[in-house]
Amino acid sequence: MTTDIIVVGAHARTADTVLSTAARIAARLSAQLVVVWVDDSRVPADPVDGSGRGATVPLDPDEYDDVAVDTSAVETAAARLRTEVQITVDVRVLAGDPGKALARVAADTHAVMIVVGSSNGPAAGLKAALHGSTASFLMHHQLVPVLVVPVSKARP
């Protein structure tokens, strides 16, 4: 018997609500949670590979190449989920486009669901207008359910 997998997108500003929601669903389904942190300021050094793993280079050629990616917040959140919800949590750190990276991990792991947070903040609207939102990309390019967790504190 295989364990179902739920993929959740995370980044430095990911609301605890998104990770907690994904963890509660994983616990109810007795599923494993794969937390995917994607550095969209970097791209894979080998675009042919396209996995997002391994060597990466900055998207902006003027940036320093030796800047370490700080994933401590995601690792800390994953450790908290392991103890609070008592589920298996795997963390993957990738580079490139978040939507494509999440889709790739979901396909590679045969995930039953992808969980992402809604965009918020003043820059979110501009980013979505220029590049499209990760949630929208996933909803239009996935065969598995995509759950978009609202993260805005504002109520209508």
Q: Where does each model-flagged region fall?
A:
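General small-molecule cofactor/ligand-binding pocket signal
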Residues: 34-36, 90-94, 147-149
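Structural beta-alpha unit
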Residues: 1, 14, 79-114, 153-156
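Glycine-rich, Arg-bearing micro-motifs that act as flexible, cationic patches
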Residues: 113-140, 155-156
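Short, hinge-like loop/turn segments at secondary-structure boundaries
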Residues: 50-54, 108-110, 132-133
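A short acidic, glycine-rich active-site loop
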Residues: 55-72, 123-124
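Small/aliphatic-rich secondary-structure junction motif
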Residues: 1-59
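Active-site phosphate/pyrophosphate- and oxyanion-stabilizing loops and adjacent acidic/basic residues
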Residues: 23, 79, 136
